[in-house]
Amino acid sequence: MNPIQHILDTYPLIVLDGAMATELERKGCNLNDSLWSAKILMEEPELIKQVHTDYFAAGADCAITASYQSTFEGFAARGLSEAEARRLIELSVSIAAEARDEFWSLEENRLNRPKPIIAASIGPYGAYLADGSEYRGNYAISEDELIEFHRPRMKALIEAGADVLACETIPCLTEAKAIVRLLKEFPETYAWISFSAKDGLHISDGTPAADCASWLDEHRQIAALGINCTPLQHIPSLIEELKKNTSKPIIVYPNSGEQYDPETKTWNGAACAESYGASARTWHEKGARLIGGCCRTKPENIQEIAAWARSLKTT
């Protein structure tokens, strides 16, 4: 079953969660580390569970796991065995599912909303490199090598019971093609693919967003496609480009409006003056069916989206 379409058959919008790392930092975590939020899986997993709970309370219909930078290679570099790495990758799913089940067990949390789903985050190859190439896509490896890189983590996340895979911040069509080829090894699994973008027309490596949508549109296991980890001013035109070239649901979860410098690993500038919720309403009107937040967004931003999303007419 396609879990995204299952919800969209009844509800006009799926509200995603927001940033994990931002919330962990607000709770006192130091994420200046190549493992990023995966470091907290090792050290303080209960904090990750609390962030998931906060987003469900804010109105999120989907939790994205803390596995974006969780790779067998990354954990091995810290001296963890393959079995230990697998346990942590699976833990990212079980923590989110536990938070969801506890939240959903209370009747007052079930009003006018679908049961939330768990999306297992699969970051790009560049996230493992931690050198900023996730925003460029200029990898020096082949499509076949990308498949070999993604296979162990994808298999572990599926076996852990994730409802859907969130293949996110993908900077190049080559990596998306590798993921689609790999998905065929798991024919009952659905995924979304969301790209990082450099402007209102192109993903990070310069490929037209329209071409990405056209290519992905033909593949059954892709449950949704779209854009994340991108300045929010580019989102309206990117939705238009995608919508013209696919019949699949469009997903968007951009950054707050600040600019990330991958060289210094710092954020600069201010968040968008317009409320995040108001911007999100514009994205929905343009055709997005799954909306949330990426870097620097907070539960308050998700609450802004849920406030108007719950008033939309269900079918």
Curated annotation (Swiss-Prot):
Its EC number is 2.1.1.10. It is an enzyme of class 2 (transferase). One of its GO terms (biological process) is S-methylmethionine cycle. The keyword Transcription does not apply. The keyword Metal-binding applies. Its cofactor is Zn(2+). InterPro entries: Betaine-hCys_S-MeTrfase_BHMT (IPR017226), HCY_dom (IPR003726), HCY_dom_sf (IPR036589), Hcy_S-methyltransferase (IPR051486). It catalyses: S-methyl-L-methionine + L-homocysteine = 2 L-methionine + H(+). Zn(2+) binds at C229, C294, C295. Gene3D superfamilies: Homocysteine-binding-like domain. This is Homocysteine S-methyltransferase YbgG. It comes from Bacillus subtilis (strain 168). The lineage of its organism: Bacteria, Bacillati, Bacillota, Bacilli, Bacillales. The gene is ybgG.
